[in-house]
Structure formats: C-alpha cells, structure tokens
C-alpha cells in the first residue's frame, strides 16, 4: 500500500520536474534575446555617437515617444511602435562619413526579437510620457530597460 503511494509520489515529482524544465530554459532564452536586443541598440547608439558623425545635430532634432512606464516585457510594444521612425531617422543620417551598416537588418532584428519577447498576444496600448526624447535619450532608455530586465533574470 505504501509502495503504491511512494510510486505515485515519484511519478508526480518526475512530472513536476519535467514540466518545470522548459521554464528555466525559456528564462535563458529570454535572457539571450534581451542580450541580442541590447547589443543591437548599443550598436546603433555607438554609430550615432561616433565623433565623425556630421549629422548628429540634425538627428537630435527628431523626437521619439517614450512610455510613461517600461518595466515589463509587454512594454516592448512601445519600442516596436517607434521602430519605423527610428529607421527613417537613421536612413536620413547616412553619409559617406557616417554609415550604420545594415540599418534595415538591425531594425528588422530588433523587430523580430521584440515580437518574440513581448509575445504576439500583447495588445498593450502604450501610455506615452508627455515629453519626447532625442534619438540618444530614446536608445539609452531602452538600453537601460534591457539591462534592468536582464538583471532580474540572473
């Protein structure tokens, strides 16, 4: 009789361990995706902050919307909504002295990662802050967001 309970207990324990295993793997996957997003955002920021960028002052005139609060992955919806304007500003700023390699690919990569991280079911309506941000502030805030989420996962 006790043997049957013990076997049931072992079976349930194995089921729990098996079912919980993907969670740790998905946390690792989320962390890796956030790290890739972070690197892409930093690459854009480094290209903009390059001392040889003659169009930086022009780029700073464009304003981007920032969410009032960005603390969860679902808030990446707000970043996704600003990717098209970001790409347009980066394309305007291209010159022979300043060229972000594969701007379209970078934006595409960011978009794919954002879609995977926030999930396709997210229909969050972004609540934007009253004040807008320059391209540098915009990128810095999203970089900080990624770093913050990564730190909670580790």
Swiss-Prot record:
SS bonds (residue pairs): 78-126
A GO BP entry: adaptive immune response
Q: What is its main location?
A: secreted
Signal sequence annotation: 1-20
The Gene Ontology terms for molecular function here are: cytokine activity; growth factor activity; interleukin-2 receptor binding
Work out whether the entry's keyword set contains Glycoprotein: yes
User: Which Gene3D superfamilies has this protein been placed in?
Assistant: 1.20.1250.10
Cellular localization per UniProt? Secreted
Q: Which domain of life is it from?
A: Eukaryota
Q: Which InterPro entries match?
A: 4_helix_cytokine-like_core, IL-2, IL-2_CS
List the GO cellular component terms: extracellular space
Give the sugar-modified residues: 23
Q: Which UniProt keywords apply?
A: Adaptive immunity, Cytokine, Disulfide bond, Glycoprotein, Growth factor, Immunity, Secreted, Signal
Describe the function of this protein: Cytokine produced by activated CD4-positive helper T-cells and to a lesser extend activated CD8-positive T-cells and natural killer (NK) cells that plays pivotal roles in the immune response and tolerance. Binds to a receptor complex composed of either the high-affinity trimeric IL-2R (IL2RA/CD25, IL2RB/CD122 and IL2RG/CD132) or the low-affinity dimeric IL-2R (IL2RB and IL2RG). Interaction with the receptor leads to oligomerization and conformation changes in the IL-2R subunits resulting in downstream signaling starting with phosphorylation of JAK1 and JAK3.
Family recorded in the similarity comment: Belongs to the IL-2 family.
Q: What is this protein called?
A: Interleukin-2
């Amino acid at each position: 009789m006790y043997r049957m309970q013990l076997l049931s207990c072992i079976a349930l324990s194995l089921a729990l361990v098996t079912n919980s295993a993907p969670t740790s793997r998905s946390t690792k996957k989320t962390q890796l995706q956030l790290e890739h997003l972070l690197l892409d955002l930093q690459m854009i920021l480094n290209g903009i902050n390059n001392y040889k960028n003659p169009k930086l002052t022009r780029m700073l005139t464009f304003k981007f919307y920032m969410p009032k609060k960005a603390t969860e992955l679902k808030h990446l919806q707000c970043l996704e909504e600003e990717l098209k304007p970001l790409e347009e500003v980066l394309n305007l700023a291209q010159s022979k002295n300043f060229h972000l390699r594969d701007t379209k690919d970078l934006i595409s990569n960011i978009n794919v990662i954002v879609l995977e991280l926030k999930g396709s079911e997210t229909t969050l309506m972004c609540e934007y802050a009253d004040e807008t941000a320059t391209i540098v502030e915009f990128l810095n805030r999203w970089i900080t967001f990624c770093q913050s989420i990564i730190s909670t996962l580790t």
